Amino acid sequence: MYAIVKTGGKQYKVSEGDVLFVEKLEANAGDVVTLNEVLACSKDGELKLGSPVVEGASVQAKVVEQGKAKKVIVFKYKAKKDYRRKQGHRQSYTKIVVEKINA
């Protein structure tokens, strides 16, 4: 059984027990979050497609940790003009474990 869920503007194919790194969710470590935007779900070989979401379907996941990804360096310059800008960015993420798919 699997489901396609949308969170943080991205889509993920999940099964029970999967570990995901998603865009930051407002929850603490140990909390259970419910992802209601289920775009499709498959159970016993039968695929349900939503338009845009599957009615009554949800995915429950447990928050393992909140964190930040590795730093990405953004460097802008203009040749021969002595113009240089260096900036770093660390994206926040939430690590979750899928516990249950309700279809």
Swiss-Prot record:
A Gene Ontology cellular-component term: cytoplasm
Any one biological process term the GO annotation gives: translation
UniProt keyword list: Ribonucleoprotein, Ribosomal protein, RNA-binding, rRNA-binding
The keyword Ribosomal protein belongs to this UniProt entry's keyword annotation: yes
InterPro entries associated with the record: bL21-like, bL21-like_sf, Ribosomal_bL21, Ribosomal_bL21_CS
Molecular function GO labels: rRNA binding; structural constituent of ribosome
Record-linked NCBIfam families: L21
Family membership noted in the UniProt record: Belongs to the bacterial ribosomal protein bL21 family.
Record note on quaternary structure: Part of the 50S ribosomal subunit. Contacts protein L20.
Function according to Swiss-Prot or TrEMBL: This protein binds to 23S rRNA in the presence of protein L20.
Protein name: Large ribosomal subunit protein bL21
Organismal lineage: Bacteria, Bacillati, Bacillota, Clostridia, Peptostreptococcales
